[in-house]
Amino acid sequence: MSNAKQCKKLQSWPTNRGDMNVSLQVCSTQTVKGFIVKNPLLILIAAGFGSLALPAHVSAQASPAEAQVNALEGLFGKNAGARRSGAKGVCASGYFVGNEAGRALSSSTAFSGSRVPVIARFSVGGGSPKASDKGRTVRGLALQFDLPGGESWQMANVSAPVFFVARPEQFAPFMQARTADPATGKPDPEKLKAFNEANPETTLQGAFLSKAPIPASYASVNYWGVNAFEFTNAKNESQFVRWHFLPEAGTVGLTDEEIKTMPDDFLVAELRKRVAASPAAFNFTVQLAERSDQLTDPTKVWPNSRKEVSIGRLVIDGVAPGVGGSCELITFNPVALPKGIKPSQDPVLLARATPYVISLSRRLPDAPK
């Protein structure tokens, strides 16, 4: 590639194939804070597969990762410039301050005690940029911690303690079972029933959301990482954890009357108004796994009796004034991790990297600049 010297390697991460790592490069002549704003060229480098230019298809037949993105597009449509999941959202910024408890668990510089710049994105679940803020879907809190030495820690958190699939191969069928039949304009109820009965664990997140209050604010809802991660400290002692962000404002949901009277778009305006008056903050905690806890199935919660430790404080003190912003070209890949933190062998976690890159490549040509 003739312009290789202009390429910047943004991140590298494992996949659910043990012999395969994926790295993301962006090649361009114009960058802002390391992220490309014009003429992007993505290169997906997979060990054993050579270099694959995106957005061209990885192969003539859709790969499992492409099938996931295709299923999202089948359900929600191809919305120009929008993320295929969490399409409706807003960029925000702030900082994180780790504490001594965090340092005891991980050697990551995120827990140094100094302010770490954070780029955030709040979102409404699903692939439609016109989704209602009153819908019973997940709310998302995606984060990128910009650490010393060029390290990056990314995560994609949701407002439910469980993920919606237990295995990667359930992802595309889950979406397809909910996709409208062209003849009726609605999902086939028999197809959906059959899928749910064959995959009961995929109904757990929806069951949780059906009983949870609809969030009144992005800043008044809990967010979970859902997957397990391995923290390793300076003494080379390891501990598996799942993390959780608890709003300092408390959890606040809409009343029945508010659900009737509120518009479909209120979360972004509410967040801007809130942060303009005073920063929004979250307590970052981790639940410590014990030997019997499930590390590889994100649809299974750990017992409430497990010890939970506060490892720092996240503060959001800025919200983008409009579309676009510093978060638009970030994948928020949950296996883009710093030293001192490793992914578990959860196949769902490891399978999320490649679809994130494919999704990014498809929306980049139309992304807000």
Regions found by a protein language model. Give the residues of each.
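Active-site-adjacent core segments of small-molecule enzymes
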Residues: 58-369
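Intrinsic-disorder-associated, low-complexity terminal segments enriched in Asp/Asn/His/Tyr and depleted
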Residues: 16-19
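Gram-negative bacterial Sec-dependent N-terminal signal peptides
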Residues: 38-57
